[in-house]
Every structure is written in C-alpha cells, then in structure tokens.
C-alpha cells in the first residue's frame, strides 16, 4: 500500500524534468492527479499528452480555486512558494510538497544528501564514483541528472543526491544518512529575502540526518544539532579528530584524514585549492557511509572534473584557457579565481558578467586585484561588476563572447590563464550555462 492515501486529489505544479518525474511516480501508483504550469507550452507538455492522455492539464495563469481543491500540491523547484495562488492554497490547508519529500518517504537505502552554493555537482559526482569503485549499487541524481523519484529501485544500496535550496523548501524531513551544506554564499537573492532566508532553506537538508559533514572554513555550513549526532569536517588546513584536510610535508601537500596522509594532491587530475576542498568533502561523505579508502582514493585519482567547472580547454601561445561557465554566482567565481590563481605561475585574465540575480559583486574586488591581470566584462550586469571592481585592475567592456575571448587573448601573457568564470547566470545572452561554455570553447579554438 502506498504511503500516500489515494482518496483525495493531487496537483503537480510545474511540468519540467522534476514535474514529469512526479507524473510518472503518481501514475505508477494509480493515484488521481492533475497537472498545471504557468507557461502556455511547458517543456514536457507533448510527452505528457502522448504518454498520459487521460491526465487533466491546465497551462497559463494558476487558478487558485482549482489549487485549493487539492489535498496536496507537488510544486516544482522552479516556482516560488510565494506565488499568490500557492499562498492561497496553503492558507486553505492544502499541503505543499515536492519530489524530494516523496522520495524521502519511499527510499529504503541510505541517502547521502549534498547541497551548497557551489561545488554540489562535483562533490555529488565524486561520491557516486567512489561508491561505484567500492562495488556499491548506487543511484546518483536529484538536482543533477536524473530526478530523484526516477532513481527509486529495490536493489539500490546507496542514494547520492544533489539538492538545491528550491528543492529543499518543499522537503519536510529528508532523514539522510549523512547530509552536508558544502558552503554558503550569496545566490538567488532575486528569490529570497536575504542571506538568512537562503541559509534557512539550505539547512533543511539536516532535518533527520544521522550524520553531518561541515566545512571548517565556513561557519554557515554548521547546523544546530544534538551533540549525539556524529559530525565530520573538511577544510584546507591541517586536520584534527574526525576531520579531513591538507598536510604539508617536504614541500608536498597531501589529502589527509586526522593525522594520516592519504594522497598527494599532485596525483589528482583536478587542480586548484577549491578542487582539493571538493575532494576532501567527498572523502568525508564517503567515509561517513563506510566506503573504503582504497576505493575512494582510486576514484579521486581517476576523476578529471565536470564540464564547465574550471575545465581546461586548451593552451595557446603559453596561455591556458579554462571554462568555468557553471560559476553562476559570486561565491563560485571566487573559488575559481582564488583556487586557479594560486595554482599558476602567471596571472588570470577573467571573463565575467551576465545576469547577476541581484548579487553584490564587491567581494570580487580583493581576489581580482590579487590574482588577475585584467577583467573582460560582458552581459546585462557588466556595469554593476565594473562599479564593484573600481580600479582594481584594467577593465574591458565587450558586447559578445567572441569579442571577449579575442580581447582576453590579447591581454594575456605567457604563463597566464584566461578564465571564464562569470559570477552570473547566463540567461541574458545564452540558453543556459552549458551553451555559454560551449561557445567559449569554440571561440578559443577559433583564435588565430
């Protein structure tokens, strides 16, 4: 028998990837439901009508009266819970839920739950690779790749989920085996009232967690939990008890656990301090669920990074080009600038700009002054970044990404690196951050 009673009506709100996974989940269980979407032609509409022609679909402005007729609304993460029709439904006593809440009710295997302003996808993928290396039947997804509900299966031994703050808003209690907030920096300020509001959403991941992993360098990642809950930590300093970190010996840095050296960072394919932090976070999470060190370290050595995350593109005339298009907020750009900037002999030429989502760019000024030779700006909020940077380094404004790459190539010197790390979303000029990254790589390849 399903955990959800089937005597009342449900509505799936939003017909993107997660919405379609909800449709499949409810249909498999024979539960009555309808689908609504604020868009006239949502991305999965044709698929829904072809596979589930019996399901009622309403597109366009949300009908509050219709939503109030349901016992439960499954809201997709792309829609704010402050949407007036949703607020009215909640006030009438309609339960507001989502795909992660349903997943948590059904999952039988332990869950590794990962959120954070940055590095979620890299750490999630790493933990998944570590589990595979340990011969675990693992399912990896959530905000990354496969929607969580599509992962559910009886033979799975471990779930590894990347979760966004939007997904966590509709999850009452995840009950993860181990949960982490990797880092917290300003993001999505166009949707939240401020950092405190955003921080609260992120920390919903810890509800019911049996173990937690925290970032020693970021106090905002540490939850208010009972002393009886095991707490592991990671950071770039020397580790102590129940901690992962870096040990330096004879001029060589090692990934380490407590007082034991594990692996020289020189054996990693991923570069930069931010990636060493990602590796340590993955080790902490894997260790918490019992993955053996030999399997985890083997997976780490084989991992070459994800596309558009500080990804090496090519070297030209002694200058390396890196695609960090996934850096859609200030915190991600800071991690790339500081991590890569400290790891090269020369300076960075930074390409930045786009849709800033209401962010404050002033935190970029100091690391840009320290690590960058120049900054090339483009996109809607280029002017805001220019104001924040002031006269820290030379600034160049351009209209297109092709022009940005050409200007960066002229500014860079041998030993430098050109880094696309926009600190902004891409939707003002591109379909998504992936397209921005692909077009950057294409422009780099086309340099004379």
Curated annotation (Swiss-Prot):
Q: Where UDP-N-acetyl-alpha-D-muramoyl-L-alanine is bound, by residue?
A: 17-18, 38-39, 78, 143, 188
Localization, per the record, is: Cytoplasm
The GO annotation for biological process reads: cell division; cell wall organization; peptidoglycan biosynthetic process; regulation of cell shape
Q: What is its EC number?
A: 6.3.2.9
Show the GO MF annotations.
ATP binding; UDP-N-acetylmuramoylalanine-D-glutamate ligase activity
Q: SUPFAM superfamilies annotated for this entry? A: MurCD N-terminal domain (SSF51984), MurD-like peptide ligases, catalytic domain (SSF53623), MurD-like peptide ligases, peptide-binding domain (SSF53244)
InterPro entries the record matches: Mur-like_cat_sf, Mur_ligase_C, Mur_ligase_C_dom_sf, Mur_ligase_cen, MurD
Q: What chemistry does it catalyse, as a reaction equation?
A: UDP-N-acetyl-alpha-D-muramoyl-L-alanine + D-glutamate + ATP = UDP-N-acetyl-alpha-D-muramoyl-L-alanyl-D-glutamate + ADP + phosphate + H(+)
Q: List ligand-binding residues for ATP.
A: 116-122
UniProt pathway annotation = Cell wall biogenesis; peptidoglycan biosynthesis
Where are the annotated coiled coils located?
none
Annotated Gene Ontology cellular components are:
cytoplasm
> Which Pfam families does the UniProt entry name for this protein?
Mur_ligase_C, Mur_ligase_M, MurD-like_N
Alphabetically sorted, this entry's keywords are:
ATP-binding, Cell cycle, Cell division, Cell shape, Cell wall biogenesis/degradation, Cytoplasm, Ligase, Nucleotide-binding, Peptidoglycan synthesis
Tell me which domain of life the UniProt entry assigns to the organism this sequence originates from.
Answer: Bacteria
Residues at which ADP binds: 119-122, 278, 309, 324, 326
General function of this protein: Involved in cell wall formation. Catalyzes the addition of D-glutamate to the peptidoglycan precursor UDP-N-acetylmuramoyl-L-alanine (UMA).
Its recorded name reads UDP-N-acetylmuramoylalanine--D-glutamate ligase
Organism name:
Pseudomonas aeruginosa (strain ATCC 15692 / DSM 22644 / CIP 104116 / JCM 14847 / LMG 12228 / 1C / PRS 101 / PAO1)
